[in-house]
Amino acid sequence: MNRSGFVALIGEPNAGKSTLLNKMVGAKISIVTHKVQTTRARIRGVSVEDQSQIIFVDTPGLFKPRRRLDRAMVAAAWSGAADSDITLLLVEAHRGLTEGVEKIISSISETGLNGKIALVINKIDKVDVNDLLSLSKEINESHPFTETFMISAEKGKGVDDLRRWLALNLPKGPWLYPDDQISDMPLRMIAAEITREKLTLRLHQELPYQLTVETEKWEEKPDKSVRIEQMIYLSKSGHKGIVLGKKGETIKAVSVASRVSIEEFLGVKVHLFLRIKVREKWMEETERYSEMGLDFRDGNA
């Protein structure tokens, strides 16, 4: 009997949601960096386990929103959880039951999420096993989780057990996607996210949060190669020189790194062209939110 359903990944920023999604899917479709709040949209990844099709929804990290974009991101996270059959709350083992996690658990109880809710303690390689057991007991006392898993998403520990449990607990029904599809994100959006990831890794402090990337042109050539033109939108003119770097070194490095990653994902030769444009109000433009897969109205205060 086939099964299929949606599994939402929620948690604080940097809890390892995107790393777990990429590990489950077997390909990199969600940004992974050391900086918080890099995932902006709800990203769906598809994994198959036996006769079950698991559709993972990687949501933006839950945090206290300050701007319209922040509010839209948090709204997308809770919406993703509300629409899912199973919700996984990821908690970092070495950080434990933080104030942020407590607020998420409180919100889970208040909103009355449908479906099963499992606790996933991630990054278990960073703490002692006795501390893990104590943390599991402490968190489970704050909410009646259906199941608890201890994993290292980065190293793959415990991930197979989690996948098997999910496969057995999804509702019975036909698969919702072709068996060879790993994401419902358009390729042009995945390519834009890859470039944004490379920018985030190269730039510092607040600058990565002040920019966005859009794929403006996607042309498949007769030789199977792809020409991709992308625009990097900045909110401040003073940031342009930083993104370009001395003699254009930064933007060149980003372009090379992004092109290599896009080629690995697509399996074809890629010709990538990046341009920069300053749009001080891009965070207030409806079109930018649509491109990121967010609802502009969710950003209303």
Show where each model-derived region lies.
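Conserved C-terminal guanine-recognition region of P-loop GTPase G domains, centered on the G4
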Residues: 48, 53, 75-148, 219-222
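Conserved, well-folded catalytic cores of nucleic-acid-processing
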Residues: 23, 27, 46-50, 65, ...
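P-loop NTP-binding site
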Residues: 187-301
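Catalytic P-loop NTPase motifs of RecA-like helicase/translocase cores
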Residues: 39, 63-64, 96-97, 127-128, ...
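Active-site glycine-centered loops adjacent to acidic/histidine catalytic or metal-binding residues
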Residues: 58, 122, 152
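Conserved G1/Walker A P-loop phosphate-binding module
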Residues: 1-75, 79-81
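Canonical P-loop GTPase G-domain recognition
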Residues: 115-116, 125-183
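Conserved glycine(s) of the Walker
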Residues: 16, 158, 250
